[in-house]
Amino acid sequence: MQKIHDHTPNPTQILGFITLFVSGAVLLFLTGLTLTGTVVGLVVLTPVLIFFSPILIPLATVLFVAVAGFLSAGGFGLAALSAISWLYNYIKGRHPPGADQIDYARMRIADTATHVKDYAREYGGYLQSKIQDAAPGA
């Protein structure tokens, strides 16, 4: 008898099961109601959609393109505004994010330009000496 009594659920478990059962039944009912409404809506609206599709499809296409255009124009405007703000802060010396990378790249480009200039000066002198060797009177 004690084993049977140990396996019986307590009132909290019973209340939890009843709550689970009731909420599951309500959700199942709402799912069926939604499915029924969807089917009835499709049955009623399909002939209307087919009849007006020569008007609705181009209209939907135009609306989609217009909305996409406005959203992308706004996004590009926001990107340009943030780039101008960053550039303003950089010029004013306020050190915006990424300024270190820009300074490093500028130094690398300047160093490379200096090396190219020095190499061109050396190579130009080398060519000048070769020309004088080839044509001593020139």
Swiss-Prot record:
Topology term for the membrane: Multi-pass membrane protein
Alphabetized UniProt keyword annotations: Lipid droplet, Membrane, Transmembrane, Transmembrane helix
UniProt cross-references to Pfam families, sorted A to Z: Oleosin (PF01277)
Keyword Repressor part of the UniProt annotation: no
GO CC annotations, alphabetized: membrane; monolayer-surrounded lipid storage body
Stretches that traverse the bilayer: 14-34, 48-68, 69-89
GO biological process: lipid storage
Primary location recorded for the protein, binned into one broad class: other
Span(s) of short sequence motif Proline-knot: 47-58
Tissue spec. comment: Expressed in megagametophytes (at protein level).
Subcellular location: Lipid droplet; Membrane
Domain of life: Eukaryota
Annotated domain remarks: The proline-knot motif may be involved in targeting to lipid bodies.
Family: Belongs to the oleosin family.
Protein name: Oleosin G
Organism: Pinus massoniana
Lineage: Eukaryota, Viridiplantae, Streptophyta, Embryophyta, Tracheophyta
